[in-house]
Amino acid sequence: AVEKGLRESCLHGVLAGYPVVFLKATLVDGSYHPVDSSEIAFKLAANLAFKAALPEAKPVLMEPIGELKVTVPDNYVGDVMGDLNKRRGRVMGMNPTGDGETVLEAEVPMAEMMSYAIDLRSMTQSRGTFTFNFVRYEDCPAAAQEKAIAAAKALAEAE
């Protein structure tokens, strides 16, 4: 019952309400009383322990990072690289294809990719293409974390 309560608590974290992952918890002591002990009591105890202990663990928000491969005509490479830098992207490589195009490989936070198709089309006069695939999660930068927490709080207050 304690584990079940902890798993349920992990569905809504303390920072912005997002699920908690990579959590390790150890039950050190416990007791059973025939009258007061019930499944709901143990679940509630786990929930209270979770809420008390998690802020002390200094949790951080994680953000999904994806691998971006952009194929653009050579004369648009500078514009696309500048745009990737604005999106907090890290350019990992540039590979000329030999036919007047270059393939840029970068790692970019998924949050920055929402309007990328439209932006790439306007930057390259509809001549650029891209693929984007999830790679891993990374710690969210402090500014982006504060923004996400503020947005989550505003959404919770609106409900």
Which residues are covered by each model-predicted region?
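Accessory interaction regions appended to the cores of large information-processing enzymes
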Residues: A1-E159
